[in-house]
Structures are given as structure tokens and as C-alpha cells.
């Protein structure tokens, strides 16, 4: 008799405990899936120090469970939906990190099906964490079925009331906390403009994803109007009439009269994945068994060279590419947003469009990965590319690094062949000058010594004390990619030095990456700090070579958004007024103004721009807004009125 009295009470207690405990378990499964592992270090370094973020994520799962349960009175469904709410984005996040080095972001929802296809084609397989999580979720669903079986039935009024209360609490949490930056920052969730991967590691998948929803809105710059645009461009045009020192006094453009400069050369852009001159580490206690940058060092003696200040670290390739092709700064866009996916959704001003519409160029892009990756298949036409050769169309290419990338990555050597073949095809089909832009993939993160056989891999022969074997192996993997990129550079310059027409080749790296899972390569040697915001880790190697001038020019460091303006200035090409403005900014205000870091004209950096630098930054943003989102008033100044029909002021 007593047993019968205690059983309902115990059952009631279990029913009360199940929702919070089950959703807490689901939260841990979510993080396990997203990270690929869940160790003691995960808790001590990430979860416990940022417990408030995980408490918010748990509350979202718990309230969602309650809302579904009140509505359906079927606990297994509530348990299953809560699990899907947490674990499905976590799985997508895991694969997204593997593919592009960045986590699952809200705007990725626009191409979920495409991402799934890319993941399948890339040879990515289900992980142990996912299999175990599925088993645990099934067990939770089964337990909830038996635990809540025979529960007292309720009529519709209390069920609706319970659902509305739970739904209201869920909405309050979403709109009153997650989508309120002032609130989330007050409780310790700090935006990370540099590295979304780190943001997700600190605050977890659910909290990071939901707080990123605030990054979807573009605000019109203060004072935006046709008069403001005209005033800036009128001043820019007038400034060209004043005699002043050239941007680069020893350059071909500065030392050759305007009547004698080459007018419409072939222009080749190569953005090489994760490229920077790793031989720089030989000044910091490292030694390699081969000269990994022999061609680069030779070409620097007869070319313009320097560094490109990248807006990205550890990922975000498309941000760098976007800046280089347009002169637009990704820093003006919401933190974490991806321009190709969100903003390059209509034809707009860019270097390819300018060359095509005003100079009669034919344009093509070559990328040895899937066309839909970063939405390049839709962004490239809007930037003015007539042709896009992607991995789907490539034949007879070699692939390497299959230990991590099971389907392999196309080699830089094969990419050189693809570039040459595409160039020859364009020259055969038309007499129009050529602009060809290429993006490589061979040296994509992650790095592991097993990606190359021992007889191929570059060896580290000396290094600072204390580095792990895995870190040395990762550095060898990375250095092998740099050696092969250097060989590609040599192959391209050798070929284009022999063609019977003027050619410009611009070669640069998109961003630095962590080598292994940390910054030990940089910190152990004193090369850089362990902060991804360190300016040293944003200055990738940049080379501008041509087959019709051998004047060496020290470019210093320039922003990635200045690559095209500087290229045109360097070789005396006709520049659009927007690029003239950026070159003036580079000459009188700053070398770069990126993600909160300003590089002064003397190469020093600051997080506190001067009033002059602020003024130039405001001009830059106002024109960028006009060309990307506004009425396109500036287009008529540059002979690109045909794009104006696509402009709408948001």
C-alpha cells in the first residue's frame, strides 16, 4: 500500500527532472558533435569560463521542449525535436569547419542543400560523436515514452495556456537576450570580429549562431545622398589635376609617360590558399631542408612586392577575395557576414565589371573547388565574370593531402595548368584583352604530416624548443604547400614571360592559419603573439609581376581592398574614380583600416584612428554603400551606368 503511494510521487519527481536533465544532456551532445571531441580541456578552457553562454543555450532547449510538450502532450516528440534543434546545427557546423575553416553561420541557411552536396562530394563521413549521439537520443526518446506514459490528460485550455507561456518565454529569450548585443555583452558574450571559429569554441554552437543573427542588417551611413557622393568624387577628380608625388615613385606607371604606357594588358590574379612566405620563420629559429620560396625571392628583385593586410584569419577566404576584386572593405559589413552569400546578389561595381564594361575585357574565374562553395556560382556573374571554371569541370588534375581531405585537393601545379589553358582558350576565342582570376586550394587548413609521404614533405631541421611533434608535422605539411605554391608561381611567370603580349600577374595569400591546433609556431619563435588579431598575422605575402617592366618596387603593406587600385596605379592603367579615392587614402591617411586596426603610413598600427583617418574611412564607406546597397550615384562617374538599373536604396 505504501509502495503504491510512493510510486506516483517518485514518478512525478522523475517527470519534473527529465526535461532539464535531458536538454542538458542534449546540449553536451551538441557541443561534442560540433567540436568532434569533448575533453576535460573543453570544459576548463571553454565551457566553464563562459558558463553564461551555455546556460542560455540550455534554457533555449529546455523552453523549446516545454513548448512542444504542452502543445502535443507527447514527451518523446518534445525530446526528439529538442535534440534536432541542438544536434542538427552542430553536425552542419562540424562539416562546415572541415570544409572552409569557419563555423555554421545564419546566412548559410540560404545554401544548405548546396553545402550538403559539397560535403558529400568532398568525401566527408559521419563521425563517432554523431553515431553515439544518435544512440543516446534514441534512448532518451524511449525513456521519455515510458516515463510519461499514462500521464493525466488535459483539456485544450491548460495545454494552450502552457504552450503560450513556454512560447512567450522562448521568444523573450530569443528577442530579449540573444538578439540584444548590449545584453549579451553585459553578461560576458563578447563579439569576435576576427575569428568566428574561436567565437563558437568559447560560447557554443547555439548561442553563437543565434547571436550572429544580429549581423544581418546593413545601416545606411549618416549623410548618404547624391550630393554627398558627388562631392567626394568631384574632389577626387579635381585632386588628380594637382601635381603631387606619385604613390610609388619608381614604378612603371610613375616613370613612363601616359602616352607610352601599356593600355590593356592581360591581367592575371592568383589568390593562393593560406599563402605567406614561411621562410620568414628562418629568422626566428626554424630551418627547412629546402628553399621553399626560391622563385618568390628571385622575382622580388624585379617586381613590386610587399604584404596584403587581410581581413581574415583562419578562414574567410571569400572576404579577402571580395576585397581584392572590388575595393570594398569587409570591415564595413556586419561582423561575421559573408559578402558573396549575403550581399553580392546583384551586378555591382568591381574590377571585372569595370574592365569588361569600360575597357572591353573578357573575364574568367578559375577555382579548383565546387562552384557553389561560398556561393561563387552566383556571386561571380554579379562581379562581372563571363566564365567560371570550377572543380566540376576540371579534368586530368592531380590531387594531394588525402589523409585529411579524403577526396584530395587539387595541386597548385595543376592549377597553373588550368590557368594557362583557360588563358589560351580565351585568347583563341576572342581578341579582347583578358582578365583572369584564380583561387587555389592545395594548402587549405588543417595540417598534418601524414598529408604527404616522407619523400615529398618538406622537413623542419631546426626549431625552437618545446614544440610538440604534431606541431612540427603540421608545419612541415604547411611548408610543403608553400614550396608547391612557389613552384606554381615560377611556372606561371616562366610561361607568361614568353607570351607575345603584355601581362600583369598579381599573386598573394588570403590569410594566415593556426598551424596545428594552436599558435605555438608563432609564439615559441617570437614571430607573433597568440592573438588572431595580431597585425603580424594579417599581412600575407603579395607580389605584382609583369613581363614588360622589371622595376623593383617596395609596396610596403597595403589593405587587401587596395590590391586592385594599387595594381592599376603601379602600371599606369586607367582607374575608376573609386579606385583613385582609395589610392589617395593610401597615400595621405593610412595603409589599411581593417577590423578595428589601422596601419599608419609609417607601418605602425593603432586601434585609435586619427580624425583624418576617420574622415577617409567615412568617405570609403559612403561610396561603398552607394555602390553595393544604395542608388549607385557613383556609377555614372565611372562609365558604368548600365549597372544602375540593379541598384536599389535599402
Residue map of PLM features:
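Intrinsic-disorder-associated interaction segments
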Residues: 7-10, 199-202, 225, 471, ...
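Ser/Thr-centered flexible coil motifs
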Residues: 105, 127, 155, 225, ...
Amino acid at each position: 500500500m505504501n509502495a503504491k503511494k510512493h510510486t506516483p510521487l517518485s514518478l512525478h519527481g522523475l517527470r519534473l527532472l527529465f526535461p532539464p536533465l535531458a536538454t542538458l544532456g542534449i546540449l553536451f551532445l551538441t557541443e561534442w558533435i560540433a567540436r568532434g571531441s569533448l575533453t576535460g580541456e573543453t570544459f576548463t578552457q571553454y565551457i566553464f569560463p563562459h558558463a553564461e553562454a551555455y546556460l542560455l543555450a540550455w534554457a533555449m532547449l529546455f523552453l523549446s521542449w516545454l513548448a512542444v510538450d504542452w502543445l502535443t502532450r507527447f514527451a518523446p516528440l518534445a525530446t526528439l525535436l529538442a535534440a534536432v534543434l541542438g544536434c542538427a546545427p552542430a553536425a552542419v557546423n562540424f562539416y562546415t569547419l572541415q570544409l572552409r575553416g569557419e563555423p555554421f553561420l545564419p546566412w548559410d541557411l540560404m545554401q544548405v542543400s548546396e553545402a550538403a552536396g559539397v560535403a558529400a562530394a568532398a568525401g566527408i563521413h559521419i563521425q563517432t560523436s554523431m553515431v553515439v549521439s544518435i544512440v543516446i537520443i534514441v534512448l532518451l526518446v524511449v525513456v521519455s515514452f515510458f516515463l510519461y506514459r499514462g500521464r493525466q490528460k488535459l483539456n485544450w485550455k491548460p495545454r494552450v495556456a502552457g504552450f503560450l507561456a513556454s512560447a512567450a518565454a522562448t521568444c523573450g529569450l530569443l528577442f530579449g537576450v540573444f538578439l540584444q548585443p548590449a545584453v549579451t555583452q553585459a553578461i560576458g558574450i563578447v563579439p569576435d570580429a576576427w575569428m568566428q571559429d574561436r567565437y563558437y569554441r568559447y560560447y557554443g554552437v547555439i548561442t553563437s549562431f543565434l547571436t550572429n543573427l544580429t549581423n544581418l542588417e546593413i545601416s545606411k551611413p549618416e549623410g548618404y545622398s547624391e550630393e554627398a557622393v558627388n562631392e567626394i568624387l568631384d574632389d577626387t577628380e579635381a585632386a588628380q589635376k594637382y601635381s603631387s608625388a606619385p604613390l610609388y615613385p619608381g614604378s612603371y606607371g610613375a616613370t613612363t609617360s601616359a602616352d607610352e604606357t601599356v593600355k590593356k594588358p592581360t591581367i592575371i590574379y592568383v589568390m593562393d590558399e593560406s599563402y605567406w612566405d614561411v621562410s620568414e620563420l628562418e629568422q626566428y629559429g626554424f630551418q627547412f631542408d629546402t628553399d621553399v620560396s626560391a622563385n618568390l625571392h628571385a622575382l622580388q628583385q624585379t617586381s613590386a612586392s610587399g604584404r596584403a593586410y587581410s581581413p581574415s584569419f583562419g578562414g574567410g577566404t571569400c572576404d579577402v577575395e571580395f576585397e581584392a576584386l572590388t575595393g570594398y572593405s569587409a570591415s564595413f559589413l556586419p561582423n561575421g557576414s559573408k559578402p558573396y552569400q549575403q550581399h553580392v546578389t546583384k551586378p555591382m561595381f568591381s574590377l571585372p565589371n569595370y574592365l569588361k564594361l569600360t575597357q572591353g575585357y573578357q573575364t574568367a574565374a578559375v577555382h579548383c573547388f565546387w562552384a557553389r562553395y561560398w556561393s561563387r556560382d552566383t556571386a561571380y556573374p554579379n562581379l562581372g565574370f563571363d566564365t567560371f571554371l570550377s572543380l566540376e569541370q576540371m579534368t586530368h588534375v592531380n590531387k594531394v593531402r588525402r589523409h585529411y581531405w579524403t577526396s584530395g585537393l587539387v595541386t597548385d601545379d595543376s592549377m597553373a595548368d588550368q590557368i594557362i589553358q583557360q588563358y589560351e582558350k580565351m585568347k583563341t576565342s576572342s581578341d579582347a584583352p583578358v582578365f583572369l582570376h584564380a583561387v587555389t586550394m592545395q594548402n587549405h587548413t588543417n595540417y598534418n604530416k601524414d598529408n604527404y609521404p616522407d619523400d615529398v614533405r618538406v622537413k623542419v631541421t631546426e626549431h625552437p624548443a618545446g614544440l610538440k611533434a604534431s606541431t612540427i608535422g603540421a608545419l612541415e605539411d604547411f611548408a610543403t604547400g608553400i614550396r608547391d605554391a612557389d613552384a606554381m608561381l615560377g611556372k606561371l611567370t616562366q610561361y607568361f614571360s614568353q607570351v607575345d603580349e603584355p601581362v600583369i600577374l598579381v599573386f598573394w595569400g588570403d590569410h594566415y592559419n593556426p598551424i596545428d591546433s594552436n599558435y605555438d609556431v608563432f609564439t615559441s619563435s617570437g614571430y607573433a603573439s597568440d592573438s588572431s588579431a595580431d597585425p603580424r598575422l594579417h599581412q600575407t605575402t603579395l607580389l605584382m609581376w609583369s613581363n614588360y617592366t622589371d622595376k623593383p618596387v617596395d609596396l610596403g603593406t597595403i589593405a587587401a581592398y587596395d590590391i586592385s587600385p594599387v595594381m592599376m596605379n603601379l602600371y599606369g592603367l586607367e582607374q575608376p574614380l573609386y579606385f583613385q579615392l582609395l589610392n589617395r587614402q593610401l597615400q595621405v591617411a593610412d595603409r589599411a583600416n581593417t577590423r578595428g586596426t589601422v596601419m599608419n603610413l609609417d607601418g605602425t598600427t593603432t586601434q585609435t584612428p586619427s580624425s583624418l583617418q576617420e574622415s577617409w574611412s567615412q568617405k570609403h564607406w559612403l561610396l561603398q554603400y552607394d555602390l553595393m546597397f544604395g542608388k549607385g550615384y557613383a556609377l555614372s562617374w565611372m562609365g558604368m551606368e548600365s549597372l544602375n538599373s540593379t541598384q536599389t536604396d535599402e
